[in-house]
Amino acid sequence: MSQPILVFDSGIGGLSVLAEIRKLLPHHDYCYLFDNARLPYGELEEQELISGCVALIDQVVERTHAAIVVVACNTASTVVLPALRATLSIPVVGVVPAIKPAAQLSKSKRIGLLATPGTVKRHYTYELISQFADDCHVELFGSSELVLMAEQKIATGQLDMVRLTQVLSPIVEADLDVLVLGCTHFPMLRDELQQVLGQGVTLLDSGEAIAKRVKTLLAETKSDEQVQEEDAHSNLLMQAFYTKAEISEGLATTLVDCGFSTLERITTINSNG
């Protein structure tokens, strides 16, 4: 059995990243860990976020013998990566908002970043804008409600389009031609976002870039024999771990439809979060 790729998020948003990784690495085993007991992360204090995430991920890495960790959460990536890399001995990949490609793609030089309040307010985000989009007018939009709406869509199959239109009204009024989806939950709402914003706004996320980075790192750390063995691997292991006491039937169905054969609640021992 190969060492799995561990994808981590606060909720179901990381499934959008997982899907991109599986396109490039279809024969690999995967673990999906989501800390839905503390969702949404954009509302947490930094130290609480760091201690909780590191304890939880470290516990699952030790249990699953993961080969690599993908922190498929923009909010966590902006604060947790240094502590996580100091704790783990395996590669850790984070999510970077697609500011650079957005600036390159924009014709009007008016772009937006839609993310959680935590991502929007952090210095790291402003550094990205200064470094890669200094020739653009950049509007920042923070919303935790959209995270919960994405979770609700997966759990129930329903979405309040009237409320979504209200939430997105400042973006419509901003007259942008490119919008960066700076939260991995938001690609789950891509069709609905496009419907409200119109075809004149291009939506960008980081899923494909993350997948390419994961493939590169695995190639650097594995021998040719290991790669060939995994390519021939047919009985894929797909495990999902969550932290909330219960998950909805709709979410469980979604995970099973994604190929997960094991769904298990996990609790942290050393976390103060």
Curated annotation (Swiss-Prot):
Question: GO: which molecular function terms?
Answer: glutamate racemase activity
Q: Which residues form the active site?
A: 73, 183
One Pfam family in the UniProt entry:
Asp_Glu_race
Q: Does the keyword Isomerase apply?
A: yes
The pathway to which it is assigned is:
Cell wall biogenesis; peptidoglycan biosynthesis
Top-level taxon: Bacteria
What EC number(s) does this enzyme carry?
Answer: 5.1.1.3
Biological process (GO) annotations held by this record are:
cell wall organization; peptidoglycan biosynthetic process; regulation of cell shape
Keywords (A to Z) from UniProt: Cell shape, Cell wall biogenesis/degradation, Isomerase, Peptidoglycan synthesis
Which PROSITE patterns is this protein grouped with? ASP_GLU_RACEMASE_1 (PS00923), ASP_GLU_RACEMASE_2 (PS00924)
S-adenosyl-L-methionine keyword on record: no
Q: What chemistry does it catalyse, as a reaction equation?
A: L-glutamate = D-glutamate
Similarity remark: Belongs to the aspartate/glutamate racemases family.
Q: Report the protein name in the record.
A: Glutamate racemase
State the encoding gene: murI
